[in-house]
Amino acid sequence: MTATNNIVNLYQPFLDYALTKLKEELELQPYPIPSGFEHKVAMTGKGKKQQEVQTTSYAHCSPKLRQIRAAHVQGGSALQVLNFVIFPHLNYDLPFFGADLVSLPGGHLIALDMQPLFRDNLQYQKKYTEPIWETFQKHQKYLPWGGDFPEEATPFFSPAFLWTRPQKTELVETRVFEAFKDYLQAYLIFVKQTEQITNSEKLAEIKEAQLRYLRYRAEKDPARKMLTRFYGHEWTEEYIHGFLFDLERKLALNPA
C-alpha cells in the first residue's frame, strides 16, 4: 500500500474498531440521522487538482448513552477527518468521549479526551480523570503536547487531554491508534460502572453542564469553515445544530 493510500484511508480502521467494540460491549440501537446528512459529496479544486470530498455520518445510542456519533470526512490525500463523540444521557454524570482526528498535507492534529462535565470538581476528577492518568502519561511520552490551544476551551477538557501534532503518518497509524483504543476502552469501563443519578439538583447541574458544552462546541466548531466551503452555509449550520450537537433541538421537542 502506498503512502498516499495510507493517508486516504487513515481513519477507517479507527472508525471500524470503535463501531465493532461498541457493538460488542453495549446494547446499541440506531440513532436517527436527519435526512440529507447520512452521506454528502462535493467536488473541490479544478483540473488535475479536482478532488471529491465525502462526508459520512454514523449514529447509535444505548441505555446510558444518548448519542454515539461519528463524522468521517474523506478528501483524498489533502484531507482526512474523523470526529467521534459520545454524549451520555442526562441522568448520568459521565464525561463525553471526544476524538478529533485531522490530517492535512502539513501534518496531523489529534485530540483525545474524556471531556468533563465538571472539570474543576476534585471529586469528579478523582472519579473520571485519575483512573486514566496512567494511560495518558503512557501515550504522552510518544505524543507530546501539541502547543497552542484556546484558553476559553480549557473548562471543556480534562487534565488527561491528549493533544498532539505528529508529523509522521506512521505515528497516527500506531501510537495514536493505540491511544484511541485505550481511551475508548477506559470510557466503556466508566459506562459500565456508572449509576443513574436521581438527585434533582444534581440532574439540573448535569443538564446545564451538557448544554454549556454543546453550545460552546456548536459555536466554535473548527470544521464549520471547511464544511461551509464544501457544502454551503445552510447545510453546514443544520448539520452542526441538527445532528452533531443536537441536544437543544431534542430538548425543545421533549423537555427533560
UniProtKB/Swiss-Prot annotation:
EC number: 1.3.7.3
Record keyword Oxidoreductase present: yes
Source domain of life: Bacteria
Catalytic activity: (3Z)-phycoerythrobilin + oxidized 2[4Fe-4S]-[ferredoxin] = 15,16-dihydrobiliverdin + reduced 2[4Fe-4S]-[ferredoxin] + 2 H(+)
GO MF terms, alphabetically ordered: cobalt ion binding; phycoerythrobilin:ferredoxin oxidoreductase activity
One family name in Pfam for this protein: Fe_bilin_red
GO BP annotations, alphabetical order: phytochromobilin biosynthetic process
Top EC class for this record: oxidoreductase
Swiss-Prot/TrEMBL keywords: Oxidoreductase
Keyword Protease applies: no
Record function comment: Catalyzes the two-electron reduction of the C2 and C3(1) diene system of 15,16-dihydrobiliverdin.
Similarity comment: Belongs to the HY2 family.
Protein name (database record): Phycoerythrobilin:ferredoxin oxidoreductase
Lineage of the organism: Bacteria, Bacillati, Cyanobacteriota, Cyanophyceae, Oscillatoriophycideae
